[in-house]
A protein has these predicted regions:
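Localized chelating/binding microdomains
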Residues: 1, 9-13, 17-18, 22, ...
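Conserved beta-strand hairpin/beta-sheet module of binuclear metal-dependent hydrolase folds
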Residues: 1-42, 124-139
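Fold-independent oxyanion-binding glycine-rich loops
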Residues: 8-9, 28-29, 79-80, 101, ...
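Short amphipathic alpha-helix with an adjacent loop that forms part of the alpha/beta core around
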Residues: 39-43, 105-109, 149
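Metallo-beta-lactamase
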Residues: 79-132
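Short amphipathic alpha-helices and their capping/turn segments at secondary-structure boundaries
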Residues: 142-149
Length: 149
C-alpha cells in the first residue's frame, strides 16, 4: 500500500492511496490544475487515478472534485449522509459516477470502511485495508472518540 499526502490544511486536502494497482484520491480540496501538478511532481498521471473518495462537503475537501471527476471521467464515492450536502455543489459529476454507500465496500482487493467523525457537517474518515496492510485517513477531527481509536 502506498499513501502520499499531497495537501493538508485549510487551503486544501488531497491524499493519494494506491494498493494492488488501484489508485484513489481521498478528497480534492485543491484546484484540478494544482492537484494534477502535485500528482505529476510525485510521478503519477491523473489518468492513472481510479476514483475519488470524499470525507465531507467543505470546500477545502471538494474544491477540485467537480472538474477533476468530469475531466478524467472518474467515479466519486461518498457516504449517503455526505452526498446530501454535495448534490448542489458537485453538478459536473455524471450521475453514473456518483457512488453512494452506507457502509463498508470493496474496490478490487481493497476494503474501505467508513467511520463517522465529529464535525459541524456529516464527515467520515476511512480505513483502507488490503491483504495484511491497513491505514486510516481522518481529517477535520473535532475530537477523538472511542470509535475512532
Amino acid at each position: 500500500m502506498r499513501v502520499i499526502n499531497l495537501a493538508s490544511g485549510s487551503d486544501g486536502n488531497v491524499t493519494y492511496i494506491e494498493s494492488d494497482g488501484k489508485r484513489f484520491l481521498c478528497d480534492i480540496g485543491l484546484s484540478c490544475s494544482e492537484t494534477t501538478a502535485r500528482l505529476s511532481a510525485v510521478g503519477i498521471s491523473p489518468n492513472q487515478i481510479d476514483g475519488i473518495i470524499i470525507s465531507h462537503e467543505h470546500s477545502d475537501h471538494i474544491k477540485g472534485v467537480d472538474i477533476f471527476s468530469s475531466k478524467f471521467d472518474l467515479p466519486v464515492f461518498a457516504h449517503e449522509k455526505v452526498w446530501l450536502g454535495l448534490d448542489d455543489k458537485l453538478k459536473k459529476v455524471k450521475s453514473q459516477n456518483r457512488k453512494i454507500f452506507d457502509g463498508t465496500f470493496e474496490i478490487g482487493d481493497m476494503t474501505i470502511t467508513p467511520f463517522e467523525v465529529p464535525h459541524d457537517v456529516s464527515c467520515f474518515g476511512y480505513s483502507f485495508s488490503c491483504k495484511n496492510q491497513k491505514i486510516s485517513i481522518v481529517t477535520d477531527l473535532g475530537h477523538v472518540t472511542d470509535r475512532i481509536i
